């Protein structure tokens, strides 16, 4: 059984979304995922971190942090994105396609739908005034590393 874990925390700024996406992808690369699997993971990290930055705190809130942790076990990847922002009043409503608390923004309201499409499991816990935890799990195909026998 292969098991590994990493955690990072950064200021809630949209510029840090790319850092989180790349760091998680680099960590998961040790499992030798397919390009599609890696793209799915990068996409959901981008969506979850962007949601935390925009909705939890407002853009680039000094002292407000987003935490991303990743745990791999065998071929399963578990990603958790946590903020201590405003929280979500109605999680089920927020998970509905096209629902957004920011209707003035083009392309808003698809974050949770995208996460649910690319991951095997998505759980959201939120308490208004205390923050939100998004936990996502994806089972990767078996490692493609094949021994060459002469």
Curated annotation (Swiss-Prot):
<comment type="similarity">
    <text>Belongs to the anti-sigma-factor family.</text>
</comment>
<dbReference type="InterPro" id="IPR036890">
    <property type="entry name" value="HATPase_C_sf"/>
</dbReference>
<dbReference type="GO" id="GO:0030436">
    <property type="term" value="P:asexual sporulation"/>
</dbReference>
<keyword id="KW-0547">Nucleotide-binding</keyword>
<keyword id="KW-0749">Sporulation</keyword>
<comment type="function">
    <text>Binds to sigma F and blocks its ability to form an RNA polymerase holoenzyme (E-sigma F). Phosphorylates SpoIIAA on a serine residue. This phosphorylation may enable SpoIIAA to act as an anti-anti-sigma factor that counteracts SpoIIAB and thus releases sigma F from inhibition.</text>
</comment>
<protein>
    <recommendedName>
        <fullName>Anti-sigma F factor</fullName>
        <ecNumber>2.7.11.1</ecNumber>
    </recommendedName>
</protein>
<dbReference type="GO" id="GO:0106310">
    <property type="term" value="F:protein serine kinase activity"/>
</dbReference>
<dbReference type="InterPro" id="IPR010194">
    <property type="entry name" value="Anti-sigma_F"/>
</dbReference>
<dbReference type="GO" id="GO:0030435">
    <property type="term" value="P:sporulation resulting in formation of a cellular spore"/>
</dbReference>
<keyword id="KW-0418">Kinase</keyword>
<keyword id="KW-0067">ATP-binding</keyword>
<dbReference type="Pfam" id="PF13581">
    <property type="entry name" value="HATPase_c_2"/>
</dbReference>
<dbReference type="GO" id="GO:0004674">
    <property type="term" value="F:protein serine/threonine kinase activity"/>
</dbReference>
<keyword id="KW-0723">Serine/threonine-protein kinase</keyword>
<dbReference type="GO" id="GO:0005524">
    <property type="term" value="F:ATP binding"/>
</dbReference>
<keyword id="KW-0808">Transferase</keyword>
<dbReference type="GO" id="GO:0042174">
    <property type="term" value="P:negative regulation of sporulation resulting in formation of a cellular spore"/>
</dbReference>
<dbReference type="InterPro" id="IPR050267">
    <property type="entry name" value="Anti-sigma-factor_SerPK"/>
</dbReference>
<dbReference type="GO" id="GO:0016989">
    <property type="term" value="F:sigma factor antagonist activity"/>
</dbReference>
